[in-house]
Amino acid sequence: MFKAQIRPGVELRLLEERHAAAAYALMDGDRDYLRQWLAFVDKTRSEEDWRKFVRASLEQFAATEGFTAGIWEGQQFIGVIGTRKIDWLNGKVELGYWIGRAFQGRGIMTDACRAVVDYAFRELRLHRVEIQCAAGNARSAAIPQRLGFTLEGTRREAELVNGKFYDLLLFSMLKREWPRMNTNEHE
């Protein structure tokens, strides 16, 4: 997968160390916005921190435990999407994502999620994809809803961000549900 066009001019590319400067600049520019939802933002203080994250992501990829891809519009880095915790025994994976504030509201992340979910079911042959997001993050929650995921429930105070516990919404999609959902436009 690790260069996949998701719409004209927008593609996913496996995150590499050479992307650290662009990724850090985007995250740092949106730090105040992103830090309310993502615990890693306050711990990521430099390009070197990003390089460490990328190295760990590449190790995860090499071990077939997940991947992290940058989202690119032309030559501009605009966000991140990835899988983690691939559970091969039970055929499931968790999907996570974030996009720069200036690129929100255009359906790019929905298209990116659609591509990764399709990859998880068709290429990795997994049975289940999960998405978790903060209950108060309406933009993030709208993505799995648009893609036809089922809201399974709320994990109460399941994530600590900035010294505050947040409830997480848990969404899931099963492989047998995906072909039906993937045939419709959800934008």
Model-derived segments and spans:
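Generic alpha-helical scaffold signal
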Residues: 17, 28, 44-51, 65
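Conserved GNAT-fold acetyl-CoA-binding loop/helix
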Residues: 35-55
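Short, polar/charged, Gly/Pro-enriched helix-capping and turn/loop motifs at alpha-helix termini
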Residues: 37, 41, 64-68, 127
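Acyl-donor (CoA/ACP) binding surface of acyl/acetyltransferases
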Residues: 1-22, 26-33, 68-182
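Short loop/turn motifs at secondary-structure junctions and domain boundaries
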Residues: 59-64, 149
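Residue-level detector of secondary-structure transition/capping positions
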Residues: 28-31, 42, 58
